[in-house]
Amino acid sequence: MGKTKNLTVEITGMSCASCAKRIEDTIGNTNGVSESIVNFATRKATVTGRAPAEEIYKIIEGLGYGIVKEETPAVSEREIAKSEWKKFLVSAILSVPVFAISMFMIHFRFSDLTQLVLTTTVIFWPGIGFFKNALKQVMHWSIGMDSLIALGAGTAYGFSVITLIKGGSGLYFESASIIITLILLGRFFETKAKGKAGEAIRKLMDLQPKMARVIRDGTEKEVPVTDVQVGERLAIRPGEKIPVDGAIIEGWTSIDESMLTGESMPIHKEEGDKVFGGTVNTTGLIYMTAENIGANTVLAHIAKLVEDAQGSKALVQRLADKVSGVFVQIVILIALLTLGGWILAGYQFNEAIIPAVAVLVIACPCALGLATPTAVMVGTGRAAEAGILIKDAASLELAHKINTLVLDKTGTITEGKPRVTDLFNINDEKETAETDNKNGLDILHIIGSCEQHSEHPIGMAIVHYVREQGIDLEEVKDFKAIAGMGIRAIYNESTVLIGSDKLMTENNIDVSELKQKAMEIKDESKTIAFLAVDNKAESVIGIGDVVRETSKDAIQEINDMGVEVVMLTGDNEVVAETVGKEMGIVSVKSNLRPADKCDEIKEIQQSGKIVGMIGDGINDAPALATADVSFAIGTATEIAMEAANITLVKGDILRACEALKLSRQTMNIIKQNLFWAFGYNVLALPVAALGFLNPMIAAGAMAFSSVSVVTNSLRLRRLRL
């Protein structure tokens, strides 16, 4: 026994939810296993604990199922569907003549023998898999969907063979062959639909290019992306995808990051900016250095998060799992009671066998097993496309119950980083990119050029603001950062100071004419910086945290959904009330420490509310952990926030609104699926037992019941967020 770890293994041979439930329970009862989840829809088991992988493999194989180890190439849903289609075609070609002979009473010399030969071929060629799996299940004291199919088709076939040998009438070869044919057709559609449900992960991984242009020994070489090493220099031309995560070291461009954030507008990138594998370089030639490769890239991490979420179980699935665990046994009991009841009612065995077979083949535990996981698969995949990463199915499920949403201010409602908000010259005139002050000084050009070498957040905010105005910067001389106060530089032979009032005072610079504006800016809880040129004060700059463009609309939409919005912030009351009023938030609490936020959330929960919390995942970690559902506002570089149930990659409250919509619609789909799955079986079994359904019709109904569940789940792919 080693340390606790997670093991994910792909399982082959599962035919229904009963199989998955049996494997899950057996592994879960193994010493050293703390949790076992087997997902029938994804064909994967996720095991948490200290039990060795080889022991888990032996348990699965001991139950009669196969495993796909890491060194074995995984079989895709597309390949499985292709195999099922071939089996169906063979079965259909052989079954049509049998059906025609029986239904249209076509009699010729060897008509009965023809039915025997064709049906035998169907049973022992395309249909042999059902019987092999059923035999394995019986040998391991387990029965599943394949057991029901084999028992139903086998009973009809066996009875017909015995009747033919005895020279009697009333053959049911067509029932046996058509049952196999329709089930194979249903399996084909089901597999194809399940493949579509799991397309999100494949689409994500397909985003990464196969090749990369690496600069080695001064020469550009095209190599497989798997050969790229950390620290290597890469070239990316316009229209090409970024191969791995890294930083731009030369050039500038616009990057389409929609696959990460869901944001359609390209993002401007220049030297020093981070770029991520799978995103698209839309305009300029850039050179970058590789920083994260393989499984360490953002793209790979997102794919892993989505895969983990799709493999988890929603709480609502527990009832379906319990029913699935005993479903097949109950169906066999009902079939035996049906057979006995018809015989006791005075019918012959050859008449009583038909409703019994219909009961066996119409039952559908698959629909029960697929009702929840397929909706979760499609829902989490659709969320990832929109830049919403959901940790597990339980989070997706609980989010639809949220009726109170708590927001932090800084970094959630606001951008969380300094921006230039005010710029006034000595004459109280607002400076713009197009105007100079009365002395002919280009204020923007001065402050941008002088601050371009600053590593302080305020200096970088000033440079960002100036560059946004489209102004080119020039080099300055004798740049010096003055700790805690600002910077000094020589611009066109003039001495420039940018910084605090303390810096101005120490250099005997009079800022009295700017004091009023400075106080107005300070009253808005913003930081101020003065500009002095040749010992004369010229401007005051206001730097603050600005509200995100989408925050107000998002909060309004959340309110319209019937969810109360509460703002909890550590900022002072004046700032908090101002932002709250601007955003239309009625309930605002200010001057709160992290522990205070937790207490506020607990108080809301005690009133019976389900609380969601949106924060930046760092200072708000305690509050995020206290909430029923936590949303982490982040960027592509912060998606590993373990504290959050849901990560909003774009860093936008609007994504939280979309997550709530998706959660509600996913739960609606799950409820519809479960209603259909339970309702179908509750109604179908007695109808079949009473003799109202031919086994062939029963087989068709069963085959398409699971298909309907998966197809309903696929509607989430078209959900507009």
Residues covered by each model-derived region:
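Actuator/coupling domain of P-type ATPases
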Residues: 54-75, 79, 108, 112-115, ...
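Membrane-embedded alpha-helical bundles of multi-pass transporters
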Residues: 104-107, 139, 158, 162, ...
